[in-house]
Amino acid sequence: MTVTTSYRRVATSTLNGVACSANSNCITVTVNDLTPGSIAADQTICSGGDPAGFTSVAATGSGTITYQWQSSTTGCNGTFSNIAGATLATYDVPSGLTVTTSYRRVATSTLNGVAVQLNCITVTVNNLTPGSIAADQTICSGGDPAGFTSVAATGSGTITYQWQSSTTGCNGTFSNIAGATLATYDVPSGLTVTTSYRRVATSTLNGVACSA
């Protein structure tokens, strides 16, 4: 049923060919026509980042509409919990999110308390652990540093590397080393200037690149 409809019963008594009719009381089935609206699409952010505020289309219905946002860290088919204070048509997730989280909005009409859940959207967190590289070395001028051993980076997406160097110390300005894009790096022999090195790891997931 999609339309509010009233009903009554007509009773007829027939005696000696004479039909007499009477109507019962009238009852009404009220249809609470609640349309949930919609909320914004999935997002991917770097760990600890700030998701964009969720845009939405407001719900419409026969009564007064109220909202409650819910979240789940076990996916759209997982268990959802109410987010305290999140009772507007839109919602802005606080910055600092470190766990992939799904969200949905529940719209409720005060007319007979009908509630409708919206589509679920997911904020995917692109986590990245940068790994580590070998310890400091001291060489003679013009010598050949030992190749830098390392622990590989791990992340949610595809991992790429870029080695950088600085002749002004670890707090100085670093520049990319051309072609140095592997997990390890071997400095060419002949180094005559004290040089600092670091490896930048990047995890790319859903077109979002996160570096450490």
Task: Describe the residue ranges of each PLM region.
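Proline-enriched interdomain boundary motifs that mark the N-terminal boundary
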Residues: 33-42, 127-136
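Extracellular recognition modules
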Residues: 6-12, 68-70, 102-108, 162-164, ...
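Short, solvent-exposed loop/turn segments at the edges of extracellular beta-sandwich modules
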Residues: 12-20, 108-114, 202-210
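Surface-exposed, flexible coil segments in extracellular/virion-facing regions
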Residues: 71-95, 167-188
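Interdomain boundary/hinge segments at the C-termini of tandem beta-sandwich modules
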Residues: 27-33, 121-127
